[in-house]
Amino acid sequence: MTFKEKLQHKYALSEQGAKDMIHAFISATISNIVLMFPVGMLYLLVKNYMEGTLKEKGILFAAGCLICLILIGVTTYIQYNATFLSTYVESGVRRITLAEKLRKIPLSFFGKKDLADLTNTMLGDVATTEQMFSHYVPQFYASIISTCLIAVSLFFY
């Protein structure tokens, strides 16, 4: 069973939803790693300040700060599109699938239930999964991956 199939099974995603979720993991991981660049710049700034070579490299640090800001902006934009927009596309698919399943249930079932309560419960659950897939799941996996990558890279520095 591939990772994509595991995601489809675990989170009840469509095939495209699983692909989008993997893309969200990757983009959030890259965004987290790019957020570490200013820390590296600060380390180099303090190191050069302590060595007394900061004046010669001022333009280099200004350019580095500008590049960091641009990279953070670009990766955050990509992460936003990968996590939030794709989540709501998948949510539409999930709502349609739910409606198709409800269509197949006999009408006598709905006569025994309070329709307002049933609708509120189901749509509340869908809204909760939307929030989970847009806010928590990609960032959780990305934080694990990026933390491991950053920890390993610190051993080599």
Where does each model-flagged region fall?
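Short intracellular "coupling" helices and adjacent cytoplasmic loop segments at the cytosolic face
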Residues: 1-2, 97-120, 124-126
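Transmembrane helix-loop-helix hairpins at lipid-water interfaces of multipass membrane proteins
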Residues: 21-75
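Hydrophobic alpha-helical transmembrane segments of ABC transporter permease domains
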Residues: 26, 30-38, 43, 126-157
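Residue-level hotspots within the lipid-embedded alpha helices of multi-pass solute transporters
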Residues: 31-36, 69-73, 85-89, 105, ...
